[in-house]
């Protein structure tokens, strides 16, 4: 067995089990998505009924049907601002991902480095991002750059914390085995620690990409002339509440879509981990 095979075995990777039947897989997807869809339809139905029965004014609480109508009528306006927000989220998330993985790798090198750096990482999250955003506008000016930084600041923390935990979760016996096989520190990191930490990294990335949407909106609230956050701020004084809700709907859809995309990359990158989880679930159900 070569070093790569030993590393894969040490990292807990097993031969890929046979895929489930396609009809069973489709049934499983339907069963998984049916409850949330039913709850969403129920909430929207109750919301619509409440507004209609009690004749609630549109500027106070628009009905879902009015929000959908606004989404259609203002499709061009919403799409234009959505493009800006998506750009801010993707670039800021990419910055957070790169910085988070590098910082986590440095922190995981030794306990001394962890004790020196980790307190500052935690302290960075105690400062409200709404306070930092105006300072970035003063230092950098208007434009997309401050929004990128705001998104990165709000998204990098879960990536760092989860990746550090993943890098430190390696079995010491596996490390000793690789050293016995002649692997150096770099080989141990690339072939053992990094593969082992990927499930943790993707867990942090899914959280990070969801909160990245919040970071983009906060940046647009503080100072911007484009984006869904700016559109919401501009619509509020005009009592265009239905447009605010339409923007919220688009933001929610954006967050869910990005979360699902990261999950898809996760399944393609570490199929062995998902197979192991699936087998554990099957054993638990049986």
Model-predicted segments: where are they?
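Generic hydrophobic transmembrane alpha-helix motif, especially the helices
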Residues: 122-158, 165-166
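C-terminal transmembrane helix and the adjacent membrane-cytosol boundary/short C-terminal tail
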Residues: 111, 168, 199, 246-286
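Transmembrane-helix boundary motif in ABC transporter permease subunits
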Residues: 92-121, 138
């Amino acid at each position: 067995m070569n070093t790569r095979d030993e590393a894969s075995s040490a990292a807990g990777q097993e031969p890929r089990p046979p895929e489930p039947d396609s009809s069973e897989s489709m049934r499983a997807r339907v069963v998984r998505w049916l409850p949330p869809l039913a709850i969403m339809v129920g909430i929207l139905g109750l919301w619509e009924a409440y507004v209609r029965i009690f004749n609630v004014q549109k500027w106070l609480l628009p009905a879902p049907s009015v929000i959908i109508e606004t989404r259609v009528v203002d499709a061009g306006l919403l799409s234009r601002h959505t493009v800006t927000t998506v750009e801010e989220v993707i670039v800021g998330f990419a910055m957070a991902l790169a910085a988070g993985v590098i910082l986590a790798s440095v922190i995981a090198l030794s306990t001394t480095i962890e004790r020196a750096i980790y307190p500052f990482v935690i302290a960075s999250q105690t400062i409200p991002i709404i306070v930092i955003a105006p300072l970035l506008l003063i230092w950098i000016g208007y434009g997309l750059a401050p929004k990128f930084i705001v998104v990165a600041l709000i998204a990098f923390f879960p990536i760092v914390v989860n990746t550090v935990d993943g890098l430190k979760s390696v079995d010491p016996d596996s490390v000793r085995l690789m050293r016995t096989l002649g692997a150096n520190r770099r080989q141990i990191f690339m072939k053992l620690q990094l593969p082992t930490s990927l499930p943790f990294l993707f867990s942090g990335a899914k959280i990070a990409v969801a909160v990245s949407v919040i970071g983009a909106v906060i940046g647009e609230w503080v100072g911007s002339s484009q984006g869904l956050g700016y559109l919401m701020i501009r619509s509020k004084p005009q009592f265009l509440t239905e447009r605010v809700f339409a923007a919220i709907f688009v933001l929610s859809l954006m967050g869910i879509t990005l979360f699902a995309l990261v999950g898809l990359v996760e399944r393609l990158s570490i199929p062995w981990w998902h197979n192991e989880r699936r087998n554990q679930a099957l054993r638990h159900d049986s």
